[in-house]
Regions:
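Short hydrophobic/aromatic patch on the recognition helix
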Residues: 82, 228, 277-278, 282
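Short, Lys/Arg-enriched, Trp-marked, Pro/Gly-tolerant hinge/linker segments that flank
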Residues: 134, 157-162, 175-202, 206-221, ...
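Terminal helix-turn-helix DNA-binding modules in bacterial transcription factors
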Residues: 234-276, 295-297
């Protein structure tokens, strides 16, 4: 029997999803981008709670109502109405919980549609962990206008590619302004320890598939292993190894659910010495074997 295939959030998989194709009045998708104006109205669950996903393309998410908790590259955010979430390319995403009638809109440009993004619009914070913006009423009204105008232009014939491209760039410049203004007006800045923690998490997201030694991360940050361990525990309440193991488990879950790799291939992909070692590690961390996890719907 063919196993239940989970929903992937890569652009091409979403584009070919039959539920997504069916609800054309609430979504737009072409070779350049996808946009959804109401996930509630589309009537299907693209995302499941407690299920990690690998998002190949970046997203601009506009929270319309309700509240939820989302982890982006191991950093957890609470996302409520009037929030904007900017998710970087190739992110690990996990939604831990959402309230009833949670509603959001999404703009999802393909990687080549806005090549200027990484270098000149968004900050380093975006490329590492994403950004959550809590907007005031005026900022929210401006962003609403961008979303509405983009939605209308997307449905003009012929397709106005340049207008769409520059409108999204303008939206991102506006979001950058809001982000920078918020940082300047908020007295509380990240402490050195918190900044080290963010840098450590970025390294874990980048290297945990192959590097699980405290010394490696300490060397990358020009710190002693003892000092790094102390800072991470003091800042986050978890040890260096707990964060590394958490990243490995998230990656393993994504591969188990969203790839055709067999368990022994996933073991190799994640640099375990053998499949038995990987299976024991996975069960110790999750309470179930990799095969049992794959069978979950």
């Amino acid at each position: 029997m063919e196993k239940n295939k989970p929903i992937s959030v890569a652009f091409e998989d979403i584009r070919n999803n039959p539920d997504f194709i069916e609800h054309s009045e609430y979504r737009f998708i072409n070779d350049d981008l996808g946009m959804v104006i109401s996930f509630q109205a589309m009537g299907f669950r693209l995302f499941r709670t407690q299920q990690p996903y690998r998002a190949k393309e970046g997203r601009i998410v506009r929270i319309m109502q309700g509240k939820g908790r989302i982890s982006i590259n191991l950093i957890e955010y609470e996302a409520t109405a009037h929030d904007i979430i900017i998710i970087p390319d190739n992110s690990l995403i996990e939604i831990s919980e959402v309230s009833p009638y949670y509603e959001f809109q999404v703009i999802m440009p393909t990687a080549n549609f806005l090549p200027v993004l990484q270098n000149s619009i968004l900050s380093e914070a975006y490329t590492r962990n994403g950004i959550r913006l809590s907007c005031n009423n005026e900022e929210w009204a401006h962003i609403s206008s961008f979303f509405s105008l983009l939605w209308n232009i997307l449905h003009c014939l012929p397709y106005r590619r340049g207008a769409v491209q520059h409108l999204i760039v303008s939206l991102l410049y506006n979001l950058k302004y809001i982000h920078e203004h918020t940082c300047k007006s908020t007295p509380a800045r990240l402490s050195r320890q918190e900044e080290l923690f963010r840098r450590f998490i970025a390294l874990v997201n980048q290297h945990s598939k192959h590097e699980r030694n405290v010394n490696f991360y300490a060397d990358k940050l020009c710190l002693t292993p003892h000092y790094l361990s102390s800072v991470i525990r003091e800042t986050s309440g978890q040890t260096v190894m707990q964060w590394i193991n958490q990243a490995v488990i998230l990656e393993a879950k994504v591969l188990l659910k969203h790839s055709n790799l067999l368990v022994f291939q996933i073991s190799d992909e994640l640099n375990f010495p053998n499949p038995s070692f990987f299976s024991k590690f996975f069960k110790r961390m999750t309470g179930m074997t990799p095969a049992e996890y794959q069978k979950q719907t």
